[in-house]
């Protein structure tokens, strides 16, 4: 149990997809203007990561891995296209559910919801799962943790950006300029967790 708690904390803070690996920065910067919208997208990313990472773990280990189906048959060269297909299917299901049950959030996310399909944070989480050879339970924990870490980063960024609306930012830095500086400072803050060994 301690191993799984360690993995969860590591994936949220130490190996944060947004602020340690800089994955998913396009949506991170574009949707982090309001906390409410950032929270909605963060929850969507958690849901997709929590389902996509373990689902792709099963597909990789029981279909694509060398010798999974038949001895001597290695289908791992199909892993990227398979992972993207699974992620796309999950995002479509999530999009339909949000449209039906949460239309305000669906409209607020706009084009960025379908872009979760090609969000490199989602694909990065799946790729790290394969690279680190996680088992099924580890992949569930890692999916939840990496999604929660990305959500933590985008909600914190949205909160800071909302406060910066009332600040006197120099004209040349307004907009994305100060946002990039803020993201860099947040990443420096998260680097302080890198010395922690769990």
UniProtKB/Swiss-Prot annotation:
It is found in: Cell inner membrane. Belongs to the NqrDE/RnfAE family. Coiled coil: none annotated. It is a multi-pass membrane protein. PANTHER family: INTEGRAL MEMBRANE PROTEIN OF SOXR-REDUCING COMPLEX (PTHR30335), NA(+)-TRANSLOCATING NADH-QUINONE REDUCTASE SUBUNIT E (PTHR30335:SF1). One of its GO terms (molecular function) is oxidoreductase activity, acting on NAD(P)H, quinone or similar compound as acceptor. NCBIfam families: nqrE. One of its GO terms (cellular component) is plasma membrane. Composed of six subunits; NqrA, NqrB, NqrC, NqrD, NqrE and NqrF. Keywords: Cell inner membrane, Cell membrane, Ion transport, Membrane, NAD, Sodium, Sodium transport, Translocase, Transmembrane, Transmembrane helix, Transport, Ubiquinone. This is Na(+)-translocating NADH-quinone reductase subunit E. InterPro entries: NqrDE/RnfAE, NqrDE/RnfAE_oxidrdctase, NqrE. The gene is nqrE.
């Amino acid at each position: 149990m301690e191993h799984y708690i360690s993995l969860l904390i590591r994936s949220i803070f130490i190996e944060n997809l947004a602020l340690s690996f800089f994955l998913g920065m396009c949506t991170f910067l574009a949707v982090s203007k309001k906390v409410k919208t950032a929270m909605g997208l963060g929850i969507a990313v958690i849901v997709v990561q929590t389902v996509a990472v373990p689902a792709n773990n099963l597909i990789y280990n029981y279909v694509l891995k060398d010798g999974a189906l038949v001895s001597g048959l290695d289908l791992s060269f199909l892993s990227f296209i398979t992972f993207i297909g699974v992620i796309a299917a999950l995002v479509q299901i999530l999009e339909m559910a949000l449209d039906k049950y949460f239309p305000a959030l669906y409209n607020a996310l706009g084009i960025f919801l379908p872009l979760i399909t090609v969000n490199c944070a989602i694909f990065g989480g799946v790729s790290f799962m394969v690279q680190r050879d996680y088992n099924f339970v580890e992949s569930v924990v890692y999916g939840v943790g990496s999604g929660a870490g990305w959500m933590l980063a985008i909600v914190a960024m949205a909160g800071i950006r909302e406060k910066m609306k009332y600040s006197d930012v120099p004209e040349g830095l307004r907009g994305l300029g100060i946002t990039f500086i803020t993201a860099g400072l947040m990443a420096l803050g998260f680097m302080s967790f890198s010395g922690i060994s769990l």
